[in-house]
Amino acid sequence: GIIPCGESCVFIPCITSVVGCSCKSKVCYKN
């Protein structure tokens, strides 16, 4: 992913995964 979703995933998974975001380097990115 290259677009930051404005969410971290250090302690919990990406809630924004419902819109296509995934965790990378402790930050949620959209592919």
UniProtKB/Swiss-Prot annotation:
Keywords: Disulfide bond, Plant defense. GO terms for biological process: defense response. There is a cross-link at G1-N31 (Cyclopeptide (Gly-Asn)). This is a cyclic peptide. Disulfide bonds join C5-C21, C9-C23, C14-C28. It holds the Pfam family Cyclotide. The presence of a 'disulfide through disulfide knot' structurally defines this protein as a knottin. Belongs to the cyclotide family. Bracelet subfamily. It comes from Viola pubescens. This is Cyclotide vpub-B.
